[in-house]
Amino acid sequence: KTPITVSRLLLDEMEDTDNVEHLKTEMIYIEGYVNMALSYLKLFNHERDMDITSVELDKVINPILKRYSRIFIRNHIGLIYENRGDRVITDAKWLSALLEQIISNAVKYTKNGKVKISFDREKNRLVISDSGIGIRSEDIPKIFDKGYSGFNGRLNQKSSGIGLYMVKKIAHKLSITIDVESEVGKGSSFFIYFNELHRKNGV
């Protein structure tokens, strides 16, 4: 068992108090950072472990939502997401790493709000929106830069400056395009466009 798993089991055996709940939430973040670090190392280790195939989005998204369910509850975040069986042509493992970063940011910077996840079949794009603190317009062009945490990251002291940089690299690996719209105090939307050639060629 990993130290994280052991710590989680010990916390589960303890009486639920505010401190224990806080520690359980922090364990989710720690596990997320570990997953991010492992994905980061694999990404730059020149591994050719791509498996481009037809992937059901629900099977990628639902495990991520389950991992972060405690934070959804703790931060009083409503989730708008419908399992529809939509499929895309991509690599499931790398897509999961990409989506986890975006979803974890959404719940990290949203309180008493909502997160919405939807798929536009016509445009072959996944949209992840939140009603969180938003991103300053001057920060948006830089959020995918390595080490850049922006004003919100410095304010909340929760940003590694690596997550969205890794998202950009994975997106390039998967031939995915990402657009971002955001307004401070109103929230952010990430538009994830899947490769049209993959869809047309069925590869």
Predicted regions and their residues:
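Short conserved segment of the HATPase_c
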Residues: 135-148
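Short helix-loop "hinge" at the ATP-lid/N-box region of the Bergerat-fold HATPase_c
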Residues: 106-107
